[in-house]
Amino acid sequence: MHNYAKARQLRRTMSLPEVLLWQELRNVDLKFRRQHPVGPFVLDFYCAAAKVGVEVDGIAHEMGEQPHKDEVRDGWLRQRGIRIVRVPAVEVLRSASDVAASIVALCRR
């Protein structure tokens, strides 16, 4: 079951790193979707043509049970043929254009 309502809400409340990366990804010749629902999950960004999902990870992804939850989620997505790229939020803040270029290069492989 897709979580469209959650995706809509997340589009309205994107974090600063997500906004910065979206500004870069929306200007490339590949189509990216932001806050895209896939089954029970919502990907920060998704390139359907390349089947690549992008997650911008803040510090919370390193704490408590979150790393395990991320592994389970990534495994579920991989089983459906979606490659997952996890990008630290601090890297996006440092250079959103460099991060976007790396993602685009991966999508073109």
Model regions and ranges:
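Solvent-exposed, charged helical/coil patches
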Residues: 1-33, 79, 101, 109
